[in-house]
């Protein structure tokens, strides 16, 4: 590609509405342009990257024996009503009617469509297992699209769906998809981790996320220092303290605390160790529990894990925190004065709270706290459960090492769905015994557009993007200095350009009449990994300058060795 025949729409200034670095650099590098909230046009440079990501995904899915299909973005509402997700999905599901007043949706996912297809096409266990995938546009009407293509409304996704007659068959395909995903992100040159994850609204029995590590990530990822254990913080078990609870050494006493409505204020004003305080959080209970609220207790320096709390049998899902009005109606005090002593609602204590002694908590009277609280002496030990987020230094759940926490960006997710959709939609086949059998399903997604943004978040510096070779828009940039004034500079540039193309290398020749500084800045901004600078002075000694975008090194290469050198660099 020649810049004179290409749309290189780079920007010097960062647009004011771009919050994260990937959004800023995708705009500045001329990869995308905003059309409306959460909607983006992909320009040539961005599309080249997107297509390379897409091709790697497609190749590895084919290698894993998945079969490519293409399903409509527009889906009839009756399929969503049949699966039960019409009511469950909420406002992110864009619903509309056609001219015949028939209801439809813009698909955010395709479980219903693929299940409908399979129940009409597959009739016998002999045809299974099968795994179908597509790379297709999705639409989710996000309440607040942000971060560019990281959280947009329209996006490109690879989704795959497998169908089985046994859990063993599903497990085999699940493991094959796990390996395929690992190969995909490795080929892209990304630093990623597969982690145990919650199944969320998709449902199912097992789930792994594939997280690209980046300081700007939205997810907290937990790792063990002593094993390969890794999990999303939502799912990481907080192990119970190994030490037994210490004996009581303080008397129970009530203290006036009119200006201490938070744990931080209590600690500061009364010089209490934060590890000797307890937070009491009231959430709505399930109707069938016979109670309106449930109290959840976590240590003052810990955070409630809402995913874990939501799975408690007496807690309403989704988790809803009680309002101050609801709290006062039942307890008679505000949220800043709550505690477990004489609390007239069901109580669930985190494992770490159950191991505490001589601790402080609200007295359920405005402006008062109890200090010196001890289990069994001052109140019975309530139900105990793991309901907190782990913190760095906690023991690993597998008993090997301690935990570290890093930030990650979710780019892939695989699920063992089981029979959630096939049961609801009556997707069956004739089994080996001649009876109808409900299909067992798996689903496997990769956010293709999100991968592009995540790669930038992980690979950039103050000058722009630093693409891994496999997904760079161009692998090599040829930068001839004043080529329009020097025949030999122009001749070598053309020769290298044509030779590299003949070797299948994506190369861009900057043949603009621009200052060298502009040419260098643009190629660094769009992230070309390898650059060749051709100048008259260096040609006197039959040399050119090579620049590596990632390590920043420069070296002189003999003109006759340039091609072999570059091929070696790109393959390395």
Curated annotation (Swiss-Prot):
It is found in: Cytoplasm. Catalyzes the attachment of proline to tRNA(Pro) in a two-step reaction: proline is first activated by ATP to form Pro-AMP and then transferred to the acceptor end of tRNA(Pro). As ProRS can inadvertently accommodate and process non-cognate amino acids such as alanine and cysteine, to avoid such errors it has two additional distinct editing activities against alanine. One activity is designated as 'pretransfer' editing and involves the tRNA(Pro)-independent hydrolysis of activated Ala-AMP. The gene is proS. GO terms for biological process: prolyl-tRNA aminoacylation. This is Proline--tRNA ligase. HAMAP family: Pro_tRNA_synth_type1 (MF_01569). One of its GO terms (molecular function) is ATP binding. It is an enzyme of class 6 (ligase). It comes from the Bacteria. One of its GO terms (cellular component) is cytosol. Consists of three domains: the N-terminal catalytic domain, the editing domain and the C-terminal anticodon-binding domain. Belongs to the class-II aminoacyl-tRNA synthetase family. ProS type 1 subfamily. Its EC number is 6.1.1.15. It catalyses: tRNA(Pro) + L-proline + ATP = L-prolyl-tRNA(Pro) + AMP + diphosphate. Keywords: Aminoacyl-tRNA synthetase, ATP-binding, Cytoplasm, Ligase, Nucleotide-binding, Protein biosynthesis. Homodimer.
